[in-house]
């Protein structure tokens, strides 16, 4: 009986001891396990932080259709809002801004549209119209970035002069006709290819076209005209001579340029007969459609 009780107590003691050792095992490695848990938590926290971060775009207009152009517009509009109360003056000569092709190199390339370029010019001209006495370096330095970078000065139109005989030479064109005209002060004599005007041009309309520049400035009978014309028909030749006479009269008096330009004699007429297309009767006329 005693031996049986002792065996049971020993067995229970081993069980209790085994349970104590099983509970005590983690306590033996508590330091290393805590360090591992801390490292795991730190890595998890870092991964969470990195997963929530993103790259900040360099431009605030990154998500627009044309970020670079919009950045330029934002800067100019900020200056406009800052100096909107500054008085403006009427500018006689505007600086040479960057052309559309030149601005495209810094304004978005192929994304740049002509309307966006016009918007830029409007802001530049508005800032440039501020009174020069109140112009601040912030505005002038910003506008200088959009000036045309070239050392060449704009060429001025050189006025043509009369030759040694007091004649003015000009060349006019219309369709395939070319006219070389000499104009000199005289009694109103007009020769075309060494022939009189009435003899060379039979149609009254052609003769009136040649005299039209002189009528526009009230100078009929004050100039002698010698024309050499070739190519085209009679109407085209008459228009070519009219074009050349208008250009030659400007040499005598540059102040007549505005009046002649309004009369339309200084602008070349580029209209040509439209070519015939295959399958059509003429340039646009279609053959009559027949159902059957």
UniProtKB/Swiss-Prot annotation:
UniProt subcellular location: Mitochondrion
> GO MF annotations for this entry?
RNA binding; structural constituent of ribosome
One of the GO biological process terms: translation
> One GO CC term of this entry?
mitochondrial small ribosomal subunit
Entry keyword Transit peptide = yes
Q: Region Disordered: what ranges? A: 273-292
For this UniProt entry, what is the primary localization, expressed as one broad class? mitochondrion
Q: Which InterPro entries match?
A: Ribosomal_Su5_D2-typ_SF, Ribosomal_uS9, Ribosomal_uS9_bac/plastid, Ribosomal_uS9_CS, Ribsml_uS5_D2-typ_fold_subgr
Q: Which domain of life is it from?
A: Eukaryota
UniProt keyword list? Mitochondrion, Ribonucleoprotein, Ribosomal protein, Transit peptide
Q: List the disulfide bonds.
A: none
Xref: PANTHER family: RIBOSOMAL PROTEIN S9, SMALL RIBOSOMAL SUBUNIT PROTEIN US9M
Q: Which family does it belong to?
A: Belongs to the universal ribosomal protein uS9 family.
Name by which UniProt lists this protein = Small ribosomal subunit protein uS9m
Q: What is the lineage of its organism?
A: Eukaryota, Fungi, Dikarya, Ascomycota, Saccharomycotina
